[in-house]
Amino acid sequence: MRRMIWIAAVAAVAVAAGLAGCGSREGADMDGIAEDIEARLAAYAETEIAANLDVLPASEREALDRMVEAAEAMHDAFVRQALPMADEIRAALDEASGPRTDSARAYFEINAGPWDRRFHHEPFFGDWEHPEGANFYPLDLSEAELASLEAGENGTNGLYSMIRRDASGALTAVPYSEFFADEYARAIAAMETAADATANESLRAFLTARIEAFRTDEFFASDMLWMDLDGLIEVVLGPIETYEDGLFGYKAAFEAFVCVADPEESARLAKFKGELPWLEANLPIPDEDKNPNRGSDSPIRVVDVAFTAGDTRTGIQTIAFNLPNDEKVREAKGSKKVLLRNIMNAKFEQILTPIAETLLVADQLGSLTAESFFLHTLWHEMSHGLGPGRIVKDGRDTEVRLELKDIYSSIEEAKADAMGPWCIFKLQEKGYFPDSIREQQAVTYLAGLFRSVRFGIAEAHGQANAIQFNYLLDKGVIEVEEGRFRIDVEAFPLAIEGLVHEILVLQADGNYGAGMAMIERYGGMSDVLAAALESLEGVTVDILPRYAVAD
């Protein structure tokens, strides 16, 4: 069953292969570079991203600069995770020549390899097949070894290890602290200098604990301290998300965010975190499936990004995150929602607004608002902290992530996306928002579906948005009028609650089969969706950030 999702995705991508002139390998030149490489590269708009560093005292500016250095080490570690056969591939790219070579090299940097992340990792340079497990696992796994890995035998399903062969040829888990010793040494040296420089006690405590985590592969203590950061600098450094492991979803990929916080805007949103227990109690699932044990601290931070690296810097740029992922931390302290304001603003202006003007019916365009985009992003991240996390399946304690394996990321992103407006509508009933939020949220949400599905349905967020679009189209909530789209504002709240219910139930049950069935039914590139995306040929797919702090 695990392989079926990839077969379906390949077929679906083929339907959408002509989008923006991209996605077809026909006619590669003699150096193996896709003929449409310039169009693929042009889909990403170079955008300068800057944070106001003038608000930082000298001590914190020094700390931030050193954390940028640590972030660069995380990027190098991530590329090692993402790129198998690195020496062979890089040598071939270095030797390539021709009019499209520079574009291929630039696109290689965007994708951390020769595979296009928008189009199910199809090669845009050479003909190497992308391994589902990236470089986390050996490339020559037997069926018996795959079964052993899937079962997590001998600790091979740990988040913080690379799977390699020992001298006898047997599979062994190599801890990140050993495998990435060089990158860790660079990051630790930079974090030590940052910890000495900062005047903020919470940042110093976190960095000190993070250094120890890098040395021991034990991240719980530093994740707990990360929840308490209260200064002007917000930072994420280390192995975090598991999207890159497309084989099992076990392995954490390296990434980094170095940001400057806005305390006043963060305080404005703090009122919402007190509603999380009430929202959990009102989720549309049986009480026994709810998770009242997740912590409710859940700080909200509004920040401007100064620098990113690793997993988050590759391909599509994120606009917010909700961390940590460790369910033990979530039960003790909740999770932190971090909104990347300058990234969000750039995407609203350059991408979401042109998409809406191209695809939505004219009489609903006035309901597209930056505030609704911001609120949906906030409640998407809040929703990651709601619903089943640690569950009991067949009498054993486990986690939703472990039971859903390779499809977890797509299902979880669909849950958070759909639950975002559900939460907003519930809070509107309590008086937090005016009645107008219903149409504004529905219209902005619809435009957002088109924005995110353009990332490609092989990517978790893109596939999650395909699920939502096709589900709502099937329910008659999304209507097509002469090539443009309308959302039924009155029917939307009930339909979105139905989708939230279906996802939460399969998560509570740890039901891989039900999750796969949802993806197979709704997660493909339907004809209606493919035609809509084709009409967006002239609209930027995503930004390509150029960080001022790096200049």
Regions inferred by a protein language model and the residue ranges of each:
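N-terminal helix-rich structural modules
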Residues: 29-206
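Post-HEXXH active-site segment of zinc metalloproteases
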Residues: 388-414
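An active-site-proximal "capping" alpha-helix that borders the catalytic cofactor pocket
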Residues: 200, 409-426
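Contiguous, non-catalytic segments that form substrate-binding/exosite surfaces or channel walls
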Residues: 176-365, 369
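Extended, compositionally biased alpha-helical segments that mediate assembly or anchoring
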Residues: 504-551
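Long, well-structured alpha-helical subdomains associated
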Residues: 421-517
